[in-house]
Amino acid sequence: MLEQILATKREELDTLTLPEPLPEPKRRPFAAALRRPRRALGLIAEVKKASPSKGIIRPDFDPVAIAKAYERAGADAISVLTDERYFQGHRRYLQEVKEAVNIPVLRKDFIIDRRQVEESARLGADAILLIGEALSPEMLEALYQEAYSIGLECLVEVHAKETLERILARFTPEVVGINNRDLHTFVTTLEATKALASLIPPSSVIVSESGISSYRDVRTIRSYGVQAMLVGESLMRQADVERAVYRLFGEDDGNGSS
């Protein structure tokens, strides 16, 4: 599936055009928000309608209302899916969410070319996702440097130990995400975070991604030494996403107490 998605991205690049010049950035610090979270563990809450493996996750999809609910519940950043074909996202969702909230916004897509980096800046993203399994270490580093040169931060995502080691041999990302889901098989286990967290330099913010759906999961990944988590599907499947965030942190009364 990953190879199929990347092939689609290469097709989309054929029609991607960018106007001149690049507007002045109005960025919100992404890594800093995760280093100083509102709770013991930072939360990147995801706005996602569908996925290739699960189909439609949230039929009544209102990205702005969802993002505002996340912010009220104490999320530290918002992740917005912009891929259309496989996740039923859209670039305008990112723009709308950025205008509606006051916390950093991450563009979640399959970025493989510098033009997508510039496009992300134009859409108002504060940070972008770079997937280690989708890029050579050389290309990932080049896109990372391109992003920072125009005021964007990056969440560098890995799943395999070998991918992490190849990246760290070149540079140390400020934020490293450990995807608990194998993008080739879609098998998900928190053991991925356990296996990789200790290999990441202490200067990096470590984010655990995917498969986090309960307060028990939150306590588990925190014990592995991560500073933040990215949670989407388990929140999006709840009718009240604001209350779902409280429950995720063991705050079942919804008033912020544990």
From Swiss-Prot:
Which EC numbers characterise this protein's activity in its record?
Answer: 4.1.1.48
**PANTHER family according to UniProt:** INDOLE-3-GLYCEROL-PHOSPHATE SYNTHASE, TRYPTOPHAN BIOSYNTHESIS PROTEIN
Q: Does the keyword Amino-acid biosynthesis apply?
A: yes
- This chain's protein is named Indole-3-glycerol phosphate synthase
Fetch the Pfam families from UniProt: IGPS
Q: Which HAMAP family match?
A: IGPS_B
GO MF annotations in UniProt: indole-3-glycerol-phosphate synthase activity; phosphoribosylanthranilate isomerase activity
| Catalytic function, reaction form | 1-(2-carboxyphenylamino)-1-deoxy-D-ribulose 5-phosphate + H(+) = (1S,2R)-1-C-(indol-3-yl)glycerol 3-phosphate + CO2 + H2O
Q: What class of enzyme is it?
A: lyase
Q: Which pathway does the record list? A: Amino-acid biosynthesis; L-tryptophan biosynthesis; L-tryptophan from chorismate: step 4/5
Which is a GO BP term held by this UniProt record?
A: L-tryptophan biosynthetic process
What PROSITE patterns is this protein classified in? IGPS
The record ties this protein, via InterPro entries, to: Aldolase_TIM, Indole-3-glycerol_P_synth, Indole-3-glycerol_P_synth_dom, Indole-3-GlycerolPSynthase_CS, RibuloseP-bd_barrel
Q: List the cysteine pairs that form cystine.
A: none
Family annotation (CDD domains): IGPS (cd00331)
The family annotation for this protein states: Belongs to the TrpC family.
Q: Which UniProt keywords apply?
A: Amino-acid biosynthesis, Aromatic amino acid biosynthesis, Decarboxylase, Lyase, Tryptophan biosynthesis
